Amino acid sequence: MMMPHLSEDLVEEILSRVPAISLKRLRYTCKQWNALFNDQRFSKKHRDKAPKTYLGLTLKDFRIYSMSSNLHGLLHNNNIDLLMEFKGKLSSLNDLNDFEISQIYPCDGLILCSTKRNTRLVVWNPCTGQTRWIKRRNRRMCDTFAFGYDNSKSSCLNNYKILRVCEKIKGQQFEYEIFEFSSNSWRVLDVNPNCIIEGRSVSVKGNSYWFATITKTHYFIRRFDFSSETFQKLPLPFHIFDYNDSRALSAFREEQLSVLHQSFDTEKMDIWVTNKIDETTDWSWSKFFTVRLINRLDYPISMMMKSPLSFFIDEKKNIILCYDKHRENTYKSLVLIVGKDKVYREFYFPESYELGRTYLCNYVPSLVQIKQSGLISTRKRKRKDFSS
């Protein structure tokens, strides 16, 4: 049956309401639909109108995977695979095997990837296939990053920034640099957060968050505001009384932050979620989930280890945790899936050849454009009808 002739505006309006993952499958239906993926105006319209899809990504042995959506089956059927390889490819690479990803930082549908030993940086949109390589000015093995955007502009589209954090003297002296997409350049940032920040950053609504400490019993959240380029101190919904308490941050949906906590002397694990995130430091939290585990979560890390413990909450409120567990005289990556009915199951990955490189995070696909060194052109399209 032939499709009726539809106006360009009507087709665009329909497609702007299709989730990004589904729209990706329709991309090559016709040239006009494919062109929308490179249209900055359409990507903004799509971001405002399309339903969101919340995916769990895991970084395992320098490759990105997506978590299986059949978590109910995983909880009750031992024959279902835990992982399926993430389908997107870095289209600008000739040989993906040469690109070993050691860190990932999702933000606004984009993923900042750092290669093994921090030799290269690339920003990637898995839905559109767009990439942008970021030239490094300084590089150290201990570098970690934060990825966000400037909220002060009327449109944050393409106004992205990367913060480089380098621990020059262990636990005492840090160096900060910031890269702006608009200027295509790095500059030294003269800031001092007056604390030690832990682990990987988490991006929510354009800003980045870490656990931070001044003493080993005084913990809080440190936020980096990419608009003002300053650090801010935010409270936790609980007290950490022991450095060995298990803890992790994660994005919840697109606009909330979640935090996991398990005290050193108990099997009870709590997850809290912010009621909202705004520019103030006056936050409120709600307890989202409590479960009592048979065993404690291991937390065998140094302060700046890049992947100690991570977790993700899916759309059905199942919780997936990942951490490196000491087992049989070595460390193996363990995944713990907890259902909303508090039934849980453990999986061990095949043995990882590098400790601390398994990491889980929340990812929301989008069609957002990556600004290249030059401006992205927004072409004026002629009025025409779409038909099959």
From Swiss-Prot:
- Which Gene3D superfamilies does the UniProt record give? 1.20.1280.50
Question: PANTHER family, alphabetically?
Answer: BNACNNG10540D PROTEIN, F-BOX PROTEIN CPR30-LIKE
InterPro entries, per database record: F-box-assoc_dom_typ1, F-box-assoc_interact_dom, F-box-like_dom_sf, F-box_dom, Gal_Oxase/kelch_b-propeller, SCF_F-box_component
Pfam families attached here? F-box (PF00646), FBA_1 (PF07734)
Q: Which SMART domains match?
A: FBOX
Where is the F-box domain positioned along the sequence?
1-46
Question: Can you say what this protein is called?
Answer: Putative F-box protein At3g17490
Q: What species was this sequence derived from? A: Arabidopsis thaliana
| Tree of life domain | Eukaryota
